[in-house]
Amino acid sequence: MKNIGFVSTRIAGTDGVSLETYKWYQILQRNGYECYFFAGELETPPDRSFLEPKAHFDEPEIKHIYDECFGTTTRDRSVSRKIHELTSLIKTRLYEFCDHFDIDIIIPENALAIPLNIPLGMAVTEFVAETGIPAVAHHHDFSWERKRFLINAVQDYLQYAFPPLLESLRHVVINSEASRQLSYRRGISNTVVPNVFDFANPPTSSRKIKRLREELGFDEDDLFVLQPTRVVPRKWIERAVELVSLLDIKKRRLVVSHESGDEGDVYPRRILEYAGRLGVDVIYMGDKVGSSRSFHTNSDKKYTIDDVYQSADLVTYPSGYEGFGNAFIEAIYFKKPIMVNRYSIFVEDIEPCGFNVIPFEGFVTKKIADRILQSLAHDQLAAMLDENYELGKKYFSYEVLEKRLLPVIESFR
């Protein structure tokens, strides 16, 4: 029996890192490991949780450091001093966490990849270097993948800790391009472990489908088009709006299942304005939707994301960039037709699997809209969606995660 400690800025809500952490937790628990959690925000079991507010990227001092260090090329001495002070504080708390739960292996979840919390990344790096504790860094996205991190005053810290090269540290990435870039930029060998879903357990039928559709104003024969993502610019929700405007349907509506997250309300407002010009009604229902597949199931929410998927007739996934494609895999799991932009990671890591979807290249045309309606009316649609499900089970199931993750964990024995 080994005790594993997950370390992140937050393990809460429905962001991709938290959801994938939950899946790793499920796999490790069912293989005899005990899991514990360290973060600045936690919705994990209280008796397995160690809260340190300074680990959160939204903590005021941490946010101040971020604001002072990005978008400029120099930093004040006081910022450097504060970074080292907080690094020392968080590192001390990591020692306490590992002592309290008798941790054998730590898994930093994106804490050594994206520099939203520089002291946390440095603290984890120093902790691993000082203790030699076995560690598996799960990288979801790197600083060089995002424009907002390119101009910065912390190249020294980025080279030092995002990510570090340490003897007892293994590295896991979620796509092939990230693997190549990590090897090329840092000379770090790594393992590709894709994001997954529990295909061995098909979804149970929701009893709320009729109520949800009626509440949103959909009649039985109306087309329910779902955008199952957060409302942020890289999701390219404009393309989904354009698609709905081109569909020859009675009610041109687009349902968005998630909230805007941490990136403000400018883009959500822009989508509403744009949709209004195109005669499309965009319905934001993120405040009513919780997760049923995370540490905290949001029992206070009226619906789950499962209810929303099962109510939909078509899923749109027009993202310009994704680290992997959780919503794509979810649509496959719930056996929904999906329109997807051929973003780079999809082209390399998902498309070759052979899924039957409606792809497009950056922009939507009337031809795409007509093809979608033809596909929805196809007498073999159910068979195609069943085949997609089997492909999902083959390439992106919990069993695939098990086969790839456990050898990494067991390599420390």
What is the predicted role of each segment?
Residues P337-N341, V357-I358:
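Short hydrophobic beta-strand element within catalytic cores of glycosyltransferases
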Residues G320:
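Aromatic "clamp/platform" in nucleotide-sugar-dependent glycosyltransferases that forms part
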Residues N152-V192, F197-R207, R270:
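A short, active-site helix/loop in glycosyltransferases that binds the activated sugar's phosphate group
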Residues D265-D307, G354:
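Nucleotide-activated donor-binding/catalytic signature segment of Leloir-type glycosyltransferases, i.e.
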Residues L376-E410:
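A charged, aromatic-enriched C-terminal amphipathic alpha-helix characteristic of glycosyltransferases
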Residues I27, Y36-I105, V289-G290:
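A conserved catalytic-core segment of Leloir-type glycosyltransferases
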Residues R213-E214, F218-K235, V241-V244, L254-H258:
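Conserved donor-binding/catalytic core segment of Leloir-type glycosyltransferases
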